[in-house]
Regions:
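The tetratricopeptide repeat
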Residues: 375, 413, 446-448
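Cysteine-dependent hydrolase recognition
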Residues: 1-406, 410, 423-424, 428
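Terminal, low-structured helical/coil segments at or just beyond the last alpha-helical repeat
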Residues: 431, 439-450
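TPR/TPR-like alpha-solenoid repeats
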Residues: 382, 420, 437-440
Length: 450
């Protein structure tokens, strides 16, 4: 299902663009008149978004429910819900982003009343819409996600959750790019390096990011893990950033913030910060809006303070994605709380690992010259991890035979290749590569998985 704001022509245009790209039937698009602002009140949300959408879905059999005309204190109908058949709900730019706290609707929820940070009903519109088929729930605090960490999400409780993602950004073109980049990346698979900025004030977050780094290294991706007390400097190495995970900076920074920077197709970025998605209309404030403006394919954010333990866990996200699952399934596998602050930005059907490394290697000659070395480098890294040192050196030789390699990238490969040759006991080849590296004038920066 695709949801658009009929008061915003670009919202409807975006919905039609997505439907055309993913072959979604026209009857699965619903456009409702909504306020043209990012933040709305609970009465506005119930009156213009939640209830009209739920009624539409019930009337057409997308949600299996019956119920009288009775309503709760917020104005929601008290449907008895038995399930739904909505694969994903894609919310388009123009649909409001977040719901402000409404004191009139606040009722203490057992377990939350003693914790002031949870005594609120503010939240993300998308997160509230995940519970369209849940039945009436207390809007105060948060609802545990029954899909969190569930490998086979076919239990009755899990089937009450609607998987919601958003196509949104500073401009129509930015938002449309989310699906365009996803489809482009699915033709080649995920190609590039990872970058992880571990610094932060909480042990849980550091543990998550350490686990994510280990997962990506086990998948063969070359990458850097920064453990300094600062964010990545603008001068940091940042070639082919197809995967980035970090936290605790208020606004986009480092190489990503440089003028003209663009992410490669397929890039997945998660920066953990309390208000990273407070607005999606700015290309310079926060994280999510600027990331989408710079061509990211999938990202995640928080519209209000979520508290660390209730945010998307990056290591769980990568676990699901690397198993071949799509963005929609993976994001909710990694999200502990609903009716809360987190949103998922991107095409729910995007499968970054739909193309295997073996398939990438078989097609490496057809890849753009700037991408091919990263596929071979990933294969070499896997061989090194398996102890197949001589085979890894052979792959590095194949990479370095590419005369079209940009000098900076060639120097990066030379460093890794020389280390691999030393490990394989091939001193003469290591010396030759080191000699070429010195002659190139490349700075002596450390390479690989720091």
């Amino acid at each position: 299902m695709i949801l658009a704001n009929s008061n915003d022509p670009d919202s409807v245009r975006l919905a039609r663009h997505y439907a055309a790209k993913r072959a979604v039937p026209p009857g699965n698009l619903i456009a409702l008149p909504m306020p043209l602002v990012e933040t709305i009140s609970w009465p506005e949300f119930i009156g213009s978004v939640y209830q009209p959408l739920q009624d539409w879905l019930v009337a057409r059999g997308w949600i299996d429910a019956i119920g009288p005309a009775l309503t709760d204190n917020t104005g929601r109908k008290r449907y008895s819900v038995f399930g739904h058949r909505i694969s994903y709900l894609v919310v388009c730019r123009g649909v409001p982003l977040r719901v402000g706290h409404e004191p009139r609707f606040y009722v203490d929820e057992p377990g939350f009343a003693s914790r002031p940070m949870f005594r609120t009903n503010q939240g993300a519109v998308d997160s509230e819409l995940t519970l369209l088929a849940y039945g009436v729930y207390n809007i105060n605090g948060w609802v545990p996600n029954p899909r969190f960490g569930v490998e086979q999400a076919r239990l009755l409780e899990s089937d009450r959750v609607v998987l919601v993602t958003r196509l949104d950004g500073p401009s129509y073109e930015d938002a449309a790019g989310l699906v365009d980049h996803a489809i482009e990346a699915e033709t080649t698979g995920l190609i590039g390096r990872f970058y992880i900025n571990v610094r932060g004030p909480h042990p849980d977050g550091e543990r998550w990011l350490d686990q994510t780094a280990a997962q990506l290294a086990n998948l063969g991706f070359d990458g850097d893990v920064d453990r300094t007390d600062n964010n990545l400097p603008a001068s940091a190495r940042f070639d082919a950033p197809v995967l980035y995970f970090g936290w605790y900076a208020q606004d986009l920074s480092g190489p990503m913030a440089l003028p003209g920077f663009r992410f490669p197709p397929g890039a997945i970025v998660l920066h953990i910060h309390s208000f990273s998605a407070q607005t999606l209309r700015s290309a310079g404030t926060g994280w999510c809006g600027p990331l989408v403006a710079r061509g990211v394919t999938a990202t995640f954010g928080n519209v209000f303070e979520p508290y660390l333990q209730l945010t998307i866990e990056p290591q769980m996200l990568m676990r699901a994605l690397s198993q071949g699952r799509n963005l929609g399934d993976s994001a909710y596998y990694a999200t502990p709380a609903l009716s809360w602050q987190t949103i998922v930005i991107g095409d729910p059907l995007y499968r970054p690992f739909a193309v295997s490394l073996d398939a990438q290697l078989a097609n490496v000659g057809a890849l753009p010259p700037a991408l091919a070395p990263y596929v071979l480098l990933r294969k070499a890294r896997l061989l090194e991890r398996e102890g197949k040192k001589a085979e890894a050196v052979a792959v590095y030789r194949a990479v370095l035979r590419n005369t079209a390699l940009e000098p900076g990238r060639r120097a990066i490969i030379l460093r890794a290749a020389a280390d691999a040759a030393h490990a394989a006991g091939d001193g003469s080849r290591a010396a030759a590569w080191e000699k070429e590296l010195v002659a190139s004038g490349a700075p002596p920066l450390a390479d690989g998985n720091k």
